[in-house]
Amino acid sequence: MNIEDYREFCLSLGDDVEEKLPFTAFHYASGVLVFYVHGHMFSFFDCDHYSVITLKCQPERIDELRAAHDCIVKPFNMSPKHWLGIDTNTAPDDLLQELTRNSYQIVKTKYKAKRS
C-alpha cells in the first residue's frame, strides 16, 4: 500500500482520527507522521523513508504475528512488548489494514473509557 493510500485509510477509520507531524523540531524525526485517536497515537511512519509503519498491538499476539509473517519487524522507537513494525515493502494490504484497525481499536477503547 503506498503512502497516500495508507494515509487515506487511517483517516477513514473514524471522525476522531487526527494526523500530525509532531516532531518537526527534531531533524531526524521531522517527517514522522502520527495518527491519533482521543489524543493518543495508534500509527506512525516517516514520510521521508516510508518503509516501516509502527502500530500498537496486544502483547500476546506479537510473537505469533512475527512467526507467521516476515513483514512483521521491530517497532521504530517504541516498546516491542506493545508495539510492532510492519514492513511496507512486503506487507500484504489486507494484513496492514487489519493490524491498523486493530491498533486504532486498542487505543480508542482504552482512552474512550478514561474520558467517560
Question: What do the predicted segments below correspond to?
Answer:
Residues 1-116:
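Charge-dense, helix-prone N-terminal extensions
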